[in-house]
Amino acid sequence: GIQRVEILRGPQGLMYGADAGGVINITTRTPDDGLGGQVSAEGGRYGTRQFAASIGARSEVGDIHLSASDFSTDGFNSRTADTELRDDDGYDNTTWHGRLGWTPTEDLRLGLVVRDVQGENAFDSCFTVDTFAPTDDCADDYDQQAWRVSADYRSGSFSHQLAFNRSETNREFFSEGASSFATEGELTSVSYLGSLQATDSLTLVYGADLETESIDDGTFDEERDQDGYYLELQGGFSDALFVTAGVRYDDNEDFGSYTSYRLSSAYLLPLASGELKFKGTVGTGFRAPSLYEIAYNGGAFAFPPASDTSLAEEESEGYDLGVAWSGGGGLYLEATWFDQRVKDEIFFDLAGFSGYLQGDGEAESSGVELAAAWRAMSQLSLSANYTWNDTEASDGSPRVFRPEHLANIGLAWLPLDERLQLGANLRVSRDAVNTDGTPLENYEVLDISASFELLSGLSVYGRVENLLDEDYEEVPTYNTAGRAAYAGLRYRF
């Protein structure tokens, strides 16, 4: 299961690659000592079914974790433009995941991670293979295998991590049952991450990643290397000031070299019954067009203007400044100003669906994020966040499908000695625009959830998504789910 989700804003190129324009860092749970796991089953509207199981064990010499899940839904008609078939567009996904760790000594850990994902998806609006006529009988199959082996070693003030990663991805598209487009992709990388604890307050982080990717769609068969090297200095001065400064150099076989940087700082100040934190980051990034984007523009289903577009690299720069306060009474407040710019942005043609296009100039997103959380009492918690996002594409128009105002309000209530858990979340979207600049309709979506522990480790749970049955579109002509109820049973041991 997931233990923690951390969202990192802006360019994060040092350790995550120069093309990381933001990172969602998901930390999975490590098994406690001994044996543990869970099984669950749920179902609901649209013929939705999900079964999942996981088991893990941990001791002084190692740990193991295995999980599997199977999800399927009949779905609903995905596009309003589908007025002939009007069929449900379903989705199926089966995922297997395994993690094995061995600690032969206190200073050495060896790890192995494997993952297999298979998915099938039905959708609308594609073209027939023989006549290139529009059709809504469309589907695609997705199959990915990935694995990683790693070794972590500590020696005094030094730590080292060496890892080998490989993934193979196959994807095939169908129109009216006939194969229309297929790709086979591979990604192989070797990475090294090292650190030196120079003093109690100063750490040096350094590393390299050597990556080779390839794609074959039957007519486009290419391979590309990209090597990256980085260095970061992390300092903590007294118990109040923390700073980082880093630089990264990337060498892309097709698009040349690029140097990026990232700086960050945080200052802590006691205030009232809590702590005030001032923080800020600034950084740059670089992204070469992917082999898939290049292959698509050169394929049979691309047409002008995308087929006439020779994609080049895009560059980004961004910064954010924020202040946060954590109080002893369970109150948390945060405000952040952000500004991110992308030069020569690569994007899919959402107006004509011709393929991938590239902006000429800078695209910008800037604004304010506000967040608050309050534990009103031992069994009641409230949370809220709001984003004002002022966007501008390279041609001066607003960036499409991005709400200028987006807010969430959440409530969690745990009565009955926490055996019963109740939750609600309201999502509000305002002032997004279509590809032609016309405004999209504003909407509010309310979700509720509940769970009850029947016995120790055994819980029944349920949720209703879109409780008020809001009829809305996040992307024009694409339907969204109406009111949908789901219920399930979970056992933890």
Residue ranges of each PLM-predicted region?
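Gram-negative outer-membrane beta-barrel transporters
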Residues: 236-243, 333, 338-341, 359-435, ...
